[in-house]
Amino acid sequence: MSLHSDESNWQTFKRLWTYIRLYKAGLVVSTIALVINAAADTYMISLLKPLLDEGFGNAESNFLRILPFMILGLMFVRGLSGFASSYCLSWVSGNVVMQMRRRLFNHFMHMPVRFFDQESTGGLLSRITYDSEQVAGATSRALVSIVREGASIIGLLTLMFWNSWQLSLVLIVVAPVVAFAISFVSKRFRKISRNMQTAMGHVTSSAEQMLKGHKVVLSYGGQEVERKRFDKVSNSMRQQTMKLVSAQSIADPVIQMIASLALFAVLFLASVDSIRAELTPGTFTVVFSAMFGLMRPLKALTSVTSEFQRGMAACQTLFGLMDLETERDNGKYEAERVNGEVDVKDVTFTYQGKEKPALSHVSFSIPQGKTVALVGRSGSGKSTIANLFTRFYDVDSGSICLDGHDVRDYKLTNLRRHFALVSQNVHLFNDTIANNIAYAAEGEYTREQIEQAARQAHAMEFIENMPQGLDTVIGENGTSLSGGQRQRVAIARALLRDAPVLILDEATSALDTESERAIQAALDELQKNKTVLVIAHRLSTIEQADEILVVDEGEIIERGRHADLLAQDGAYAQLHRIQFGE
């Protein structure tokens, strides 16, 4: 999926401006300060004319006496304006980057699951960190240079034409050449900047995979594989950086050479008798110094072009992400609490990019308060059915109804409030156990309710032995807990939510036999007044289900109660024999 926008720099900057203008007070102050800074530099050069024409040649002139104080005052103004401009623009850029990161983060949270199926976590992290930091460069350092150097160029040009328009006319020829050179390198910088973003995404992704899979790397001796992988993407990033440096290193001397030709032309014209007769030493010195002074802002503008283009390329990528469609939430129906009756009617679903349907014409019902179990081989489509219940994906055809209303008619937040999910892939947050159990509902539950849920899930057995009990911080994804402990915290979270419909996707898969029996007792008690969809690998956990559905290659091939399915001696009976070694 391409995340780059096809917008021009101007269109991109207009979109970026919607963020910048929110902090226009700081922008106005910094712009005024930059103009004052540039004016101070220009005025100092202009002092050369009276110094040469009047100061040294006129013994009675007071100019030499006041000149040191003028220079001191100008330097003070220059320093103060420099501080004000840098501070204010840094304040503006910091806020702009913060707002863009917030919006991007919020956008990610509302993206459909299929988006994360296709994008690497490391690449997306790079967008939030590296790309947004490039925007800071465009909105602070680049803008500082553009405004300050732009004001300097305007001031110096004005000074030159004011003192000698004849000598200054040479710039009319030089200016288009400089503009063409800057435009050419800008396009090159922009292309390289996009490649750098992609390369940085690969670096982040490679590092993230190694860090998350560190135990696998150690277990299988994969250090050399990961080292080579990371070396490759790191070298790619280095190559792109060197391309940028090369382009910038070539651009700077080219601009300097063009400016040198302009100086050559000025010196040549000054030797012409008709022009020389009208020049005073002070006038010539001011014009020559101003033209020489143009080299610094021209070089700075060329250098900052690369930074500005990196910022614009990053903006295009970020805006491209923000333009991606979020989860469709067109439903209008809301229910305070549903009864929990679920009807799956002729559902067919195919994952994006796949040709074969994951589910084909699946139909079944779960009456209120009943339990239906899904069994079958891995990849048969069991978890897909659960994902369709909560609209992590939408069906291709058919419908899934909750209390007689199509799940697509519900508002997403309202729909998902009626489901509690315990997955085989437990995710916990770097927070306290209590906050993980009451996730996204802090303040809605009392401490006693949280503790009761933990006891029902048999989690208090290990929580009470932890340093701060329920207030113990468990690390990223619960790294300080065992697999079974993490599973019990997730079950406690589902118990506390008290949703009408429970989805247990291999909910006890990480538990030992003793813990599983204890948890199963708690789940049995919980399921009395709930509609439950159980996805099970261990057949012993679903023997009491009201109906068992055997799923194979996206189709339901058998259905019935445990004893009936065993009597049929079909696929379920075969699974049972394999699992129990019969």
UniProtKB/Swiss-Prot annotation:
Top-level class of the enzyme under EC nomenclature: translocase
UniProt key word Transmembrane helix: yes
Catalysed reactions listed for this entry: ATP + H2O + lipid A-core oligosaccharideSide 1 = ADP + phosphate + lipid A-core oligosaccharideSide 2
Domain notes: In MsbA the ATP-binding domain (NBD) and the transmembrane domain (TMD) are fused.
Protein name per UniProt: ATP-dependent lipid A-core flippase
Subcellular location: Cell inner membrane
Binding site for ATP: G376, R377, S378, G379, S380, G381, K382, S383
Entry's EC annotation: 7.5.2.6
Transmembrane segments: 27-48, 63-85, 144-168, 170-188, 244-266, 283-302
Gene Ontology cellular-component annotations: plasma membrane
Subunit structure: Homodimer.
Any one of the GO BP annotations: transmembrane transport
Superkingdom of origin organism: Bacteria
Taxonomic placement: Bacteria, Pseudomonadati, Pseudomonadota, Gammaproteobacteria, Vibrionales
Membrane topology classification: Multi-pass membrane protein
UniProt GO molecular function: ABC-type transporter activity; ATP binding; ATP hydrolysis activity; ATPase-coupled lipid transmembrane transporter activity; identical protein binding
Keywords: ATP-binding, Cell inner membrane, Cell membrane, Lipid transport, Membrane, Nucleotide-binding, Translocase, Transmembrane, Transmembrane helix, Transport
UniProt domain ABC transporter: residue ranges: 342-578
Cited function: Involved in lipopolysaccharide (LPS) biosynthesis. Translocates lipid A-core from the inner to the outer leaflet of the inner membrane. Transmembrane domains (TMD) form a pore in the inner membrane and the ATP-binding domain (NBD) is responsible for energy generation. Shows ATPase activity.
Family membership noted in the UniProt record: Belongs to the ABC transporter superfamily. Lipid exporter (TC 3.A.1.106) family.
All residue ranges annotated as the ABC transmembrane type-1 domain in the record: 28-310
